[in-house]
């Protein structure tokens, strides 16, 4: 895949007009299924805009968004591959993240990029 610049990615994200919309049953079902399959306490469907990570669906995490620089998803959207961080305390990308060093003390992360037909990675 050729690299898409950040402005192109954001333009495509905004065209979907999904940011800050209410929760939707379809997304909630996907998150619930992921929680069941992977037996994890937290499942998020997130989108990354210029400054934040916004959650279209969230199970086990009550915050509607986080700053982009705290988003593990920010790493996920850099590749077409699934990102797995086995120990967030020891991974250089996440060890100093406030979500690792403080509440909710994230230790494990797995995320798959959400990729549009235009090959824009919008979130995870």
Pin down the residues of each PLM region:
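Signal-transmission linkers at sensory-effector interfaces
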Residues: 1-24
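Regulatory sensory and allosteric helical modules in signal-transduction proteins
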Residues: 11, 41-42, 48-58, 63-107
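Amphipathic alpha-helical regulatory segments at dimerization interfaces
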Residues: 16, 29-37, 75, 79, ...
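Helix-loop-beta substructure at the N-terminus of cytosolic sensory domains
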Residues: 20-53, 68
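Structured loop/turn residues at beta-strand edges in well-structured enzyme cores
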Residues: 38, 104, 120
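Short coil/loop residues immediately preceding or within conserved phosphate-binding loops
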Residues: 40, 109, 122
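A short, aliphatic-rich beta-strand micro-motif
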Residues: 107-118
